[in-house]
Amino acid sequence: IWEENEMNTTECIRTRRSIRKFKPDPIDHFLLESIISTASYSPSWKNSQIVRYIAIEDSSILNSIMNNYTPDFNSNIIRQAPMLIAMTFVKGRCGFERDGSFTTKKGDRWQMFDAGIAAQTFCLAAHEAGLGTVIMGIWDEDGITKLLDFPKDQELAALIAIGYPDIHPDAPGRKSVDELLTYR
């Protein structure tokens, strides 16, 4: 759907920003479905594909989240975004053996690891499609879980505001490769 906007991977990664101000234009459902289709290719533990997405457009649900379940700085972002994605993961599949025991010392932390990979892939696919995103991690998990009526086997991993950017911030500073890379 967005062939005219295609960019290479490096350009997509280097130009993506966390967007906190959005235009009011709605997001076409076909476009969102294309982004989700791309994000579905995120790597996951034993290809478990545990991430699920709930697209929230209903103003009464958005208002409830803003007024009751997020701090003001996140509520201000959600207020402007035409859509909010509640990203969940299916519990008990990543990092586990069939008998329910942990495969590694990391235990069930692989669930959030896989959710993080999927969130990044979702945000990069949205950026390539001309949309902006910001991942939010501070919210009332119990309240949002009850409000959105998640299945019992799912857990909220992130809220992602998404829409057409109304700002284009500069890149923040980055650490040098020398600070990030060690050879042994």
Where does each model-flagged region fall?
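Short, Lys/Arg-enriched N-terminal segments with co-localized hydrophobic residues
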Residues: 1-6
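C-terminal helix-cap and adjacent tail motif
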Residues: 9-19, 24, 93, 157-184
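Short amphipathic alpha-helical segments
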Residues: 32-37
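Small-aliphatic-rich amphipathic alpha-helix that forms the alpha element of a beta-alpha
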Residues: 39, 85, 103-147
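Glycine/small-residue-rich phosphate/adenosyl-binding loop
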Residues: 47-115
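Short secondary-structure junction motifs
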Residues: 48-51, 131, 157
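A glycine-rich helix N-cap at a beta->alpha junction
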Residues: 75-84, 149-171
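Short secondary-structure boundary segments
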Residues: 89, 138, 164
